[in-house]
A protein has these predicted regions:
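Catalytic cores of carbohydrate-active enzymes across secretory and cytosolic contexts
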Residues: 1-329
């Protein structure tokens, strides 16, 4: 059976939907969900993700932890398998390691004279939080692929760096692909981590067959890290990291949008009403920005830039409407 005909397992922290009261289905937020929903609707897909809300946990329990069909608000249909980790483990995973530590490293946002300050609290959060949630999701994936020959598993983002190693240990025949949706920083930025944590992360992600990034510079940074931090032989021209008797392909895949989904949303009456409201509020000129409210988006710098623009060009006073549409992060 070709890889295009085999069932596909997607794994991410955040799933395509979350559930609210009364089985309300809400579309998952973030660029990862936006990017993957189009793929999921064109393949035989089971999407494994963390249960994010109390209603998600109840839905997982209702289906005995197994996959179940869902329909997104846009009408896309596929299977979802929600995994409930212990609240304590998930809190350490998300609020100590994934976001405050890994995300900051990969966006060069540490104030290195003060942070990170990695002590027992952080190392225990990695062992009993980050690794535990990765293990929970890995077990869910292994259950799904138990009877599938050479299963195809696509892992996503910085939340799940140790998961591929757990899959590889149990299923050496699996085809594992990991796409990192954020930058990959240069090797010196990773030296702030204790060696044990750093090597566990890198050996986990190098258990994949293919590792993908948005840009060639992120791809190059990752390969340089593998050479500098782990001493692996790297072929920069071919995009290969040699890990013992294995070759890991490292690729740059700029992630496309789901054009069909965008066109479908654009034709919705609600979008037309929103457009009319924007035009009603417009003066001679309109500046519209849409961002998630997180540090890497430089939201405050955008406001400052508009302030400088008005200082330098007073002729535009009262002639420009500036609207910032900020999504919770």
């Amino acid at each position: 059976v070709s890889s295009s005909e085999r069932p596909l397992i997607l794994v991410s922290n955040r799933g395509p939907v979350t559930f609210g009261p009364g089985d309300e289905v809400r579309r998952g937020t973030g660029g990862l969900v936006t990017a993957l929903i189009g793929l999921a609707s064109h393949r035989d897909v089971t999407w494994v993700a963390s249960a994010m809300t109390d209603e998600d946990v109840l839905m997982a329990e209702r289906h005995a932890g197994g996959p179940f069909p869902i329909t997104t608000p846009e009408g896309r249909e596929f299977r979802v398998k929600l995994v409930a980790s212990s609240p304590e483990a998930y809190d350490s995973f998300y609020n100590i390691i994934a976001n405050p530590m890994l995300w900051f490293i990969q966006h060069y946002l540490w104030d290195l004279s003060n942070a990170p300050d990695i002590r027992r609290h952080e190392t225990e959060a990695f062992e009993f939080g980050y690794n535990v949630v990765n293990e929970d999701l890995a077990r869910a994936v292994l259950d799904e692929i138990e009877e599938v020959e050479s299963p195809v598993v696509m892992v996503h983002d910085y939340h799940l760096y140790t998961l591929p190693g757990l899959i590889r240990r149990e299923r050496p025949d699996a085809v594992l692909h990991h796409f990192v949706h954020i930058p990959w920083s240069q090797s010196d930025s990773w030296r702030v981590l204790p060696t044990m944590i750093r090597e566990e992360i890198y050996n986990g992600i190098l258990a994949n067959d293919i590792v993908g990034f948005h840009t060639r510079s992120y791809r190059r940074n990752f390969m340089q890290c593998c050479e500098d931090l782990l001493g692996y032989e790297v072929d920069f021209q071919r995009g290969i990291v040699h890990c013992g008797d294995r070759e890991v392909w490292v690729r740059a895949y700029p992630l496309p949008i789901d054009s069909g989904g965008v066109l479908s949303v654009a034709s919705h009456p609600r979008v037309h009403r929103f457009e009319q409201e924007l035009l009603r509020r417009r003066r001679d000129h309109l500046i519209l920005r849409v961002d998630r409210a997180d540090l890497s988006k430089n939201v405050l710098r955008g406001f400052s830039a508009f302030d400088v623009f008005l200082e330098q060009h007073p002729e535009f006073h009262e002639k420009v409407t500036f609207i910032a549409q900020l999504m919770p992060s």
